[in-house]
């Protein structure tokens, strides 16, 4: 046992008999409730307390949490499958859940054992929204910093116990450094700037802004933000690999985050296929109202094309997730780090999954007819939801450019170089 492992106490898991199969069945069983509450959740800006409690009860928030701190440590594929199921019921709820529930993994990988013990706490209850964009004004004080500022798009914050942020932090010696930090819920306020017409899509994703006002961040709650692309600078692994004895807690984040988006978008595409299929079975043909639209060859072809792209998106999402897990396992076996090229390979596969899923939703929306333009139409909601990915940084040209730069043996731009 490593010194780090011996320094941290263990917590019992809530349900020692939980299996991935039972977890996924519970997530799928939520689908009718999530669909019934879509309008309400979008107006509120996040899912209902009843859904939150159901996710707590089924153990969904603890999938990636290490066993030492009361989690199930079921792995990344179990997580993306759960995210997909929830997103199939309501894409915005899938986004909210995914980005509140996954950062226990980041905590378990990169913060020291004593901090993990403090933040997981005596019950192992930890959920954190995160923003990657650097922000805040930082003042050095005894033992840490006081930080103030507005951190927008903190998806999942209404159901979170903590907030992870990113800042350019002054250093006692040398230039400021890009770092991640954690604050507890009691030190922040949530701005009422999400839900309803505050956004075009993903209205129930809980992507409110977080405001910090002289929040205290102890030095030990700060870690360098150099774990997005590569573990090449971590030959001995991370706090997490040593503490938990699991190479999955290498925690290289950019590739992994892209897998989550693949799951959200694939779930959205499945939801759109479900809705379009129901429409074809119940709506009449415009010029032959004696027949349902399911007899219309063009609609049959559109459904088949969209379903094919949805199935491709699902296969690519799972392939990217398994590739990331294999890269972590390789480190455990051979000590071989995850390189920048490795991470961008995972990211690029996930991006193609997201692209295929978006195209599936968009073609179904275009083929559905004018009725889906009305407020409350599910296909309209799904169309608006995928546009939120289309404008997200994950879909922008920066990452293909970096992949091209590596192929040309050219340096990456800051802060990735």
Features from the language model and the residues they span:
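Basic/polar N-terminal segments that are highly enriched at the extreme N-terminus
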Residues: 1-25, 29, 416-417
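C-terminal helix-coil-helix/basic helical segment that borders enzyme active sites and/or dimer interfaces
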Residues: 35, 39-42, 312-352, 365-368
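Charge-rich, acidic-biased intrinsically disordered regions
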Residues: 51-54, 113, 289-297, 326-345, ...
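Generic structural signal for well-ordered, non-transmembrane alpha-helical segments
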Residues: 25-28, 267-270, 304-311, 347, ...
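Glycine-rich phosphate/cofactor-binding loops in nucleotide/flavin-utilizing enzymes
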Residues: 368-417
């Amino acid at each position: 046992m490593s010194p780090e492992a011996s320094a941290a106490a263990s917590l019992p898991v809530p349900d020692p008999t939980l299996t991935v199969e039972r977890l996924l069945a519970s997530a799928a069983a939520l689908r009718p409730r999530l669909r019934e509450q879509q309008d309400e959740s979008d107006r509120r800006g996040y899912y209902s307390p009843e859904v939150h409690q159901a996710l707590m009860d089924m153990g969904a928030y603890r999938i990636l949490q290490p066993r030492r701190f009361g989690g199930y440590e079921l792995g990344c594929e179990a997580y993306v499958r759960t995210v997909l199921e929830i997103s199939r019921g309501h894409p915005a709820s899938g986004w909210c859940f995914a980005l509140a529930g996954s950062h226990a993994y980041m905590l378990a990988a990169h913060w020291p054992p004593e901090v993990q013990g403090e933040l997981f706490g005596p019950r192992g209850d930890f959920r954190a929204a995160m923003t990657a964009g650097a922000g805040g004004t930082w003042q050095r004080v005894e033992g840490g910093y006081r930080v103030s500022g507005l951190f927008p798009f903190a998806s999942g914050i209404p159901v979170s116990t903590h907030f992870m942020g990113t800042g350019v932090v002054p250093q006692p010696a040398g230039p400021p450094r890009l770092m991640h930090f954690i604050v507890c819920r009691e030190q922040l306020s949530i701005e009422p700037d999400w839900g309803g017409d505050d956004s075009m899509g993903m209205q129930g994703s809980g992507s409110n802004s977080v405001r910090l006002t002289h929040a205290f961040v102890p030095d030990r709650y700060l870690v360098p933000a150099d774990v997005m692309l590569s573990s090449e600078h971590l030959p001995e692994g991370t706090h997490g690999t040593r503490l938990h004895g699991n190479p999955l807690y290498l925690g290289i984040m950019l590739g992994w985050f892209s897998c989550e988006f693949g799951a959200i978008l694939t779930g959205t595409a499945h939801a759109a296929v479900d809705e379009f299929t129901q429409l074809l079975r119940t709506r009449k043909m415009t010029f032959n109202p004696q027949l349902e639209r399911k007899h219309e060859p063009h609609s049959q072809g559109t459904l088949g094309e969209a379903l094919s792209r949805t199935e491709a998106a699902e296969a690519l999402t799972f392939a990217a997730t398994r590739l990331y897990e294999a890269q972590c396992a390789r480190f455990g076996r051979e000590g071989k780090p995850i390189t920048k090229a490795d991470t961008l390979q995972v990211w690029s596969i996930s991006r193609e999954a997201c692209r295929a899923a978006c195209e599936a939703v968009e073609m179904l929306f275009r083929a559905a007819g004018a009725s889906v333009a009305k407020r409350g139409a599910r296909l309209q909601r799904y169309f608006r939801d995928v546009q939120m990915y289309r404008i997200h940084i994950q879909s922008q040209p920066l990452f293909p450019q970096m992949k091209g730069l590596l192929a040309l043996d050219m340096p990456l731009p800051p802060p990735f170089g």
